[in-house]
Amino acid sequence: MAKLRMEKKGRGGKTVTVVYDLPNNAAFLKELSQELKRACGTGGAVAENTVELQGDLRDRVRDHLMKKGWQVKG
């Protein structure tokens, strides 16, 4: 199950969508990050077993992950 949250604190007022509770596999995280960035048309990064995307993209990310068969919370 993947979980989503939105963060602003400590980011200069910028909004970031964080996908966490993902499998601890660097190749998987990199591939998922690329996929989500393409699907949402935004930038992002992989950091400490999470995928961070620029902007409040929770709805788009939730829809994309659910289409791939993931259970999503948040």
Regions found by a protein language model. Name each.
Residues 1-47, 59-74:
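Long, charged, low-complexity intrinsically disordered regions
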Residues 50-55:
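A generic structural motif
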